[in-house]
Amino acid sequence: VALDDVLTNDSTPALTGTVNDPTATVVVNVDGVDYPAVNNGDGTWTLADNTLPTLADGPHTITVTATDAAGNVGNDTAVVTIDTSLPVVSLDDLTTNDTTPALTGAIDDPTATVVVNVDGIDYPATNNGDGTWTLADNTLPALIDGPHTVAVTATDPAGNTATDTATLTIDTVPADLIGAITIPEDLNGDGILNADELGT
């Protein structure tokens, strides 16, 4: 009989493993309490979802024991780790004249997968493992001027997900630094602007 280590965000998880005797009785012991499992008769056994009580976050020792009709006993031990903590991911609003900008933000889990969604399209980002994530320059298609909704989602190995949203504003219109230019009127029609016409 066998059981692999498990990492999950389900605090009452189903458990499954292998058993080489289709008639053996299988019992799963979690934190010192026995739970009868089902021998499926196909080389696997199952402890149904929600059979276990709610388990606290952290590692739990699991021992599975199979007893055949002759009284022979086999067992295996594994660890089920419960992780219901959400990753923390963030992205700030950004205004830029780059139509295919790089994006970066913070992530508290160096093992989480990070995906950036811009205008409804997903783009895999890089978790740098140092508390930051990055979507490389020129990964995005050329974006039109104006605001774009950006959502960044992090998923940890246990399956917990968290999302943050921000606004990416593209502005490629040059600023009007000069302002309006007023040309004095040639009041006497001589083709020359004199001091009176210039207002000096």
What are these regions (language model features)?
Residues 74-87, 164-184:
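Flexible, low-complexity linkers/stalks enriched in Thr/Pro that connect modular domains
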Residues 18-25, 106-113:
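Short proline/glycine-enriched turn/loop motifs at strand-loop junctions of beta-rich domains
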Residues 51-59, 138-147:
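Surface-exposed, short loops/turns at beta-strand junctions within beta-sandwich domains
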Residues 43-50, 131-138:
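Short strand-edge motifs at loop-to-beta-strand transitions and within beta-strands
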Residues 2-11, 93-99, 185-200:
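Short, solvent-exposed loop/linker segments at the N-terminal edge
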Residues 69-75, 157-163:
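Short, exposed coil/turn segments at beta-strand boundaries within extracellular/luminal domains
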